[in-house]
């Protein structure tokens, strides 16, 4: 046996002499990792590790896939044409004790003439890499998708929340409105409370600049203020840069492929299907080395900061809101009445400043709105009576335009 594999035999002899793998690499055209693997093999088997394991090569299939199971998996592809082999296999696990691997599922689909599921979209350009969260619940991403057609004439929209580190689908809340901007802000708030009740509070939220938490250089809107008061740091991506919210953007496409809203008869059916598929994606869908996200990230099961609806008011901190707003300075142009608008509430600055630019900031000690000219001279102050805990939590910070405060 020692002479049939001369190169391996030399490795074995060097291993017996306790040689350094780095020295062997210097004399043989092999990688360090290869030598280390051979040494580990000799350590485990001795001289029996010299011969190759030809008898163990390849996979042996115990039995062929039963025809009813093959027909079931093919019918599943017909019913869900955008499902991949892994998702079909997980669907079969709910009905059979033993199911074939994903590669076998692909082979049966090919023999049946069923085209493979469409691949994901490839990026059109190379974008700057955005640092990703390093642990579960460090940062969540959320995004809305609208105008989702159901089986009938009804159209709905949904809000999807995804953990940035693991990519786990945490919750999708479906709303009856077709347009996202038509969903009442209080319904969105209650939807987020559902997410918090099930998962706790994240450290950060990464969002875009759309309704109802968008901020394009202005003061944070009332929905963002409410989240900040819960101790959640808001991270706004630059305008027109959805790739910086890429985890949830990809989840939106995958979620629509899996849930297939057009096959649901009503909103409740779509909501139930989303809940089931999200649980499957977290707990069973292969993510890394065949393991699910649930197994790869044990801390994904629950965020460190728990949330209880009844204790929200006692845990909510208005001082965090004032500190966050105080970091912003907003430019305004004084109108013909000598006033400017803040949160759709009119604030009087003075008629001598009509047509001039003023800069508005918040003094958190009051809290007080401070109006200054371009030179930094203070012009006027107003009590920030709209930034109370009661108004922020009830999402009634913003008033109607033209109403004097």
Where are these regions (language model features)?
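Short, amphipathic alpha-helical "recognition" segments used to contact nucleic acids or chromatin
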Residues: 2-19, 70-79
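Basic, flexible linker segments flanking DNA-binding modules
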Residues: 49-142, 147, 299-302
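A short acidic/small-residue loop/turn micro-motif
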Residues: 163-164, 175-183, 386-387
């Amino acid at each position: 046996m020692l002479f049939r594999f001369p190169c391996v035999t030399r490795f074995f002899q060097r291993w017996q002499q306790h040689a350094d793998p780095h020295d062997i690499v210097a004399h043989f055209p092999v990688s360090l990792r290869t030598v280390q693997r051979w040494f580990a093999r000799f350590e485990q088997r001795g001289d029996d590790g010299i011969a190759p394991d030809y008898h163990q090569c390849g996979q042996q299939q115990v039995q062929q896939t039963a025809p009813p199971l093959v027909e079931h998996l093919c019918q599943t592809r017909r019913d869900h044409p955008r499902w991949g082999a892994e998702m079909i296999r997980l669907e079969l696990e709910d009905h059979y004790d033993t199911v074939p691997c994903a590669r076998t599922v692909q082979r049966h689909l090919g023999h049946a003439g069923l085209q493979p599921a469409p691949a994901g979209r490839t990026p059109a350009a190379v974008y700057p890499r955005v640092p990703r969260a390093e642990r579960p619940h460090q940062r969540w991403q959320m995004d809305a998708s609208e105008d989702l057609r159901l089986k009938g004439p009804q159209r709905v929209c949904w809000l999807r929340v995804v953990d940035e580190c693991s990519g786990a689908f945490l919750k999708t809340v479906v709303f009856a409105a077709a347009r996202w901007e038509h969903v009442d802000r209080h319904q969105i708030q209650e939807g987020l409370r559902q997410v918090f009740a099930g998962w706790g509070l994240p450290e950060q939220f990464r969002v875009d600049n759309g309704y109802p938490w968008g901020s394009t250089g202005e003061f944070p809107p009332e929905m963002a203020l409410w989240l900040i008061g819960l101790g959640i740091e808001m991270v706004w991506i630059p305008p027109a840069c959805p790739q910086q919210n890429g985890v949830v953007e990809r989840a939106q496409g995958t979620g629509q492929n899996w849930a297939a809203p057009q096959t649901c008869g009503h909103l409740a059916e779509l909501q139930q299907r989303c809940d089931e598929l999200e649980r499957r994606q977290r707990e069973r869908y292969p993510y890394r080395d065949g393991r699910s996200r649930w197994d790869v990230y044990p801390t994904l099961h629950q965020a460190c900061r728990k949330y209880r609806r009844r204790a929200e008011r006692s845990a909510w901190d208005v001082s965090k809101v004032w500190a966050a707003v105080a970091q912003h300075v907003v430019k305004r142009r004084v109108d013909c009445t000598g006033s400017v608008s803040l949160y759709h509430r009119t604030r009087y600055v003075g008629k001598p400043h009509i047509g001039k630019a003023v800069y508005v900031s918040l003094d958190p000690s009051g809290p007080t709105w401070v109006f200054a000219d371009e030179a930094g001279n203070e012009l006027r102050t107003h009590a920030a009576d709209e930034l109370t805990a009661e108004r922020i939590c009830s999402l009634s910070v913003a008033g109607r335009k033209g109403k004097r405060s």
